[in-house]
């Protein structure tokens, strides 16, 4: 061990060390331009280089050195080289693959020089350099092509080659450690570990390795789907000095995962989170002191050995963290119990106290004729179903074997494993790669991100090959099955079994350094009852060898192919299952840890018929000489199999249940087929019809509510349950009316979308969820004035009022409703929800105007708990008190909150506008000037749909298409996706929804912060003026943007243009939704609105593409996929009034006037400038190559006054419309 490494370990044992912060964040603050990235050397490089931050070590080394020094000055002990994207793979984006080694070397050398300088200043605090290996821009375990899940655009070997080149340069440049960071795909990281170890061996060095992964969102998983512990298990073989987490999340969100890692990691733990989560404008709001306070709590809890920062963090953050952890004890390395720690997407730990582990055997071409046929016929989808069935039947590992003479075993193994990676319900378990061919094994290992098992290696080809293979397996990070097989052949007696296993164990642990807990012995299971006397003791020999191995070879595990033992009875499944059950009963008692079995055909020992169990035990334990004959005689009695009729009867079993259970089943499963029939049967059994609702129907809905609350049902299922409930209630209503009875409920709530707002999807979902929990909902619809809400609440004697809104003017209307409730003496709770609402706005603006309980509800899933607490005699007072205390804290924090960046005057902001050289740029001439109506069919638009927000509407979190394979919500997401596409088919075929729109292109020029729009090319007659706002916070390295900056100034003499558009998913949206509501079908009511919303957005995307390629025509050859369109990989923008770049809603009126929108489309604006129908989009078109989306964010009084003057509005009106953007207190 080098003195540097010894120093580092000594420091880690004494205190919490500090890593640096965000490199990209700091580079951005330097406001570098294209020429800065190029320098002299790359002045003529054939592609743009701005954004290639790693190149700056060659073209602007003084900037990188200054950042390193700033972090050292802030207290960092370790700095990271500026090489996050320096592999040949990532550098290919800039055609700089050949410079990868040079950049890595220069970066390490630069960081080394800075570290040495600071160490010389304070020798008692040595500084270290971590050579960074980033994740690359490719994923080895995820297909980039949704249509080909087995496809990969990078291989393990390509990653290894790239990482080796980078590692060599980093080491030679002077790095003290290698940091493999921001791991979002564990297979990439396994390739990095493999490469680093290989290169260390070639260079004759052994530096410490640091590993840091990324939990991407609230699911608690990496991008490639692994949990924290699965991720750790997969890379534990690296024997890293540190293991940690970074990026994607802030301290609040990351805490639980760092805590989990601290619990399971035998090594030191690191964390370098982001400065909170990015806000709606992509900025990081968590200030240094707040972040440091959170990090200190982590340190006090004993989670940390090293801490630093990632995105959004600066030297200020690192300095605050350094002070926060100073003097606190570092995390002590825990004493972790010895266990074989495997992983798929989830961990599987096999220790001394573990139960028997089932290894699924049916994905083996040598053992399953069906699976072999499917693979040979390349029916991989059906082959995946075989694997899925094994996992669903209880297999904790699946064994995969492709060794068949007529198969390309390597290709079949790679394809099947690649497909499994895209099936979370299969990939959650570890993989056992089973082959007698080393080449197949190695190909398979390069495909799995988890820690799997190789089945198998042995000493049959001699010790040299055995050691060579074992070392490679260790480097790949796999556990290994070792067959009891040596140069003399397979062990068939108890003595030979332990002799070979003992010898292999000694070689593996002493010569190879293989962890004993990752050694799994297979002492050979052979068939019994063959009629050959020498075979009679085979089972007993195996069972005895299990006892020997456990006694002599500490921590080693034992496995075996269980079906081998019953091979003599193939074709007689009941007897084979009995043999397996008895064999396992005794083998497990003697130490067998796992077995390759058909997980769907495991009998229970105690459930076997006594005569069959006794006869099988005679054979397994070799208790009688005539055991084989007796079992053969008995076997025919038990031959047989389940019939299709029996299977069908079992499938329809629920229809034979009593009516109460049938109703519950229909409600939970969302089945409407039998609901009237079963409801009638329940009515016949009840004394009064109301009892059916209050009894079995509500009992069933309570089950639905419980399952939803526990996360075992998802919103689309709940809405389907509500549809079943409503149909049952509708059936009963005439009978209830006749009896003049009314049912009881848990409470009554009036809900409404406030005046001026037409959006109601979220409100509808909340209503359905509450109805599922026996609350009576009075839904007043959309655009409801305050007086109607309050009048209805009094008339129906409501227990609560709920307000919803999507557009920012709705926030003011909610304040108005609260004031009216106070004036009229209401005391019932007021609930606030909707896309633009927030806890902060509720606390600061709404709650203070109403003395009754006022509660912000973030989403539908939280509504039930809030409503239940507010209406509970025992919980209400405490809940209200806690909420009020929380909101008071929010108000205090809001009052104290200072902007992350200070405001500037409007004059200063204008001086820092987009400094564009208009002399060197000629704006493209629009091909089709004027206003045109446009239509697009649903079939055209469905190709432009961004499905991710659709799933968000239904509270299913995840990005499309990955959400369809999500382990938690994937099955429901698939059902929902199918229903949505079925609805699209219906809407299209029957022309029930007809998207329409209008577009216009006009001559235009900038005048100050406004845009004059002209009637024609003479530019003498101004049709209208589009007014815009400018960013008004201090921008270091960036312009203070205003949308007008993207249009040529009038004084430049350049002729420029602007476009405007308005589109809707269809005027028929509300009528369709109302029709479904009349049928008591909330599910399809919400579905049609959600689809109309997606069609409107798709229409906006489609029309923008047509504008770029045809109407304006500045990008006629553009050819982008839908994914690229969603990522906005094109020139130009289409900002919408009411959104961050132009947040003032009344500008929609300018578009309506300019395009005569209502005449051409039927679309309307409400008094709050909400668009009707709700599924509508409108906005502007800009063509400028540097046009971009941005957030105006907070503005000051001088700009509000100026804007009011330009618009001809009062300052008070402008302040009302721009309330969320005011950087001052207008009151």
UniProtKB/Swiss-Prot annotation:
<feature type="domain" description="B12-binding">
    <location>
        <begin position="746"/>
        <end position="881"/>
    </location>
</feature>
<keyword id="KW-0862">Zinc</keyword>
<dbReference type="InterPro" id="IPR037010">
    <property type="entry name" value="VitB12-dep_Met_synth_activ_sf"/>
</dbReference>
<feature type="binding site" description="axial binding residue">
    <location>
        <position position="759"/>
    </location>
    <ligand>
        <name>methylcob(III)alamin</name>
    </ligand>
</feature>
<dbReference type="GO" id="GO:0008705">
    <property type="term" value="F:methionine synthase activity"/>
</dbReference>
<keyword id="KW-0170">Cobalt</keyword>
<dbReference type="GO" id="GO:0009086">
    <property type="term" value="P:methionine biosynthetic process"/>
</dbReference>
<dbReference type="InterPro" id="IPR003759">
    <property type="entry name" value="Cbl-bd_cap"/>
</dbReference>
<dbReference type="InterPro" id="IPR004223">
    <property type="entry name" value="VitB12-dep_Met_synth_activ_dom"/>
</dbReference>
<dbReference type="GO" id="GO:0008270">
    <property type="term" value="F:zinc ion binding"/>
</dbReference>
<feature type="binding site">
    <location>
        <position position="946"/>
    </location>
    <ligand>
        <name>S-adenosyl-L-methionine</name>
    </ligand>
</feature>
<keyword id="KW-0677">Repeat</keyword>
<feature type="binding site">
    <location>
        <begin position="756"/>
        <end position="760"/>
    </location>
    <ligand>
        <name>methylcob(III)alamin</name>
    </ligand>
</feature>
<feature type="binding site">
    <location>
        <position position="694"/>
    </location>
    <ligand>
        <name>methylcob(III)alamin</name>
    </ligand>
</feature>
<keyword id="KW-0486">Methionine biosynthesis</keyword>
<dbReference type="InterPro" id="IPR033706">
    <property type="entry name" value="Met_synthase_B12-bd"/>
</dbReference>
<dbReference type="InterPro" id="IPR011005">
    <property type="entry name" value="Dihydropteroate_synth-like_sf"/>
</dbReference>
<feature type="binding site">
    <location>
        <position position="808"/>
    </location>
    <ligand>
        <name>methylcob(III)alamin</name>
    </ligand>
</feature>
<dbReference type="InterPro" id="IPR036594">
    <property type="entry name" value="Meth_synthase_dom"/>
</dbReference>
<dbReference type="GO" id="GO:0046653">
    <property type="term" value="P:tetrahydrofolate metabolic process"/>
</dbReference>
<feature type="domain" description="AdoMet activation">
    <location>
        <begin position="897"/>
        <end position="1227"/>
    </location>
</feature>
<dbReference type="InterPro" id="IPR003726">
    <property type="entry name" value="HCY_dom"/>
</dbReference>
<feature type="binding site">
    <location>
        <position position="1134"/>
    </location>
    <ligand>
        <name>S-adenosyl-L-methionine</name>
    </ligand>
</feature>
<dbReference type="InterPro" id="IPR011822">
    <property type="entry name" value="MetH"/>
</dbReference>
<keyword id="KW-0808">Transferase</keyword>
<comment type="pathway">
    <text>Amino-acid biosynthesis; L-methionine biosynthesis via de novo pathway; L-methionine from L-homocysteine (MetH route): step 1/1.</text>
</comment>
<dbReference type="InterPro" id="IPR000489">
    <property type="entry name" value="Pterin-binding_dom"/>
</dbReference>
<feature type="binding site">
    <location>
        <position position="310"/>
    </location>
    <ligand>
        <name>Zn(2+)</name>
    </ligand>
</feature>
<feature type="binding site">
    <location>
        <position position="804"/>
    </location>
    <ligand>
        <name>methylcob(III)alamin</name>
    </ligand>
</feature>
<feature type="binding site">
    <location>
        <position position="311"/>
    </location>
    <ligand>
        <name>Zn(2+)</name>
    </ligand>
</feature>
<dbReference type="GO" id="GO:0032259">
    <property type="term" value="P:methylation"/>
</dbReference>
<keyword id="KW-0846">Cobalamin</keyword>
<dbReference type="GO" id="GO:0050667">
    <property type="term" value="P:homocysteine metabolic process"/>
</dbReference>
<dbReference type="Pfam" id="PF00809">
    <property type="entry name" value="Pterin_bind"/>
</dbReference>
<dbReference type="InterPro" id="IPR050554">
    <property type="entry name" value="Met_Synthase/Corrinoid"/>
</dbReference>
<dbReference type="InterPro" id="IPR036589">
    <property type="entry name" value="HCY_dom_sf"/>
</dbReference>
<dbReference type="Pfam" id="PF02310">
    <property type="entry name" value="B12-binding"/>
</dbReference>
<dbReference type="GO" id="GO:0031419">
    <property type="term" value="F:cobalamin binding"/>
</dbReference>
<feature type="domain" description="Hcy-binding">
    <location>
        <begin position="2"/>
        <end position="325"/>
    </location>
</feature>
<protein>
    <recommendedName>
        <fullName>Methionine synthase</fullName>
        <ecNumber>2.1.1.13</ecNumber>
    </recommendedName>
</protein>
<feature type="domain" description="B12-binding N-terminal">
    <location>
        <begin position="650"/>
        <end position="744"/>
    </location>
</feature>
<dbReference type="GO" id="GO:0005829">
    <property type="term" value="C:cytosol"/>
</dbReference>
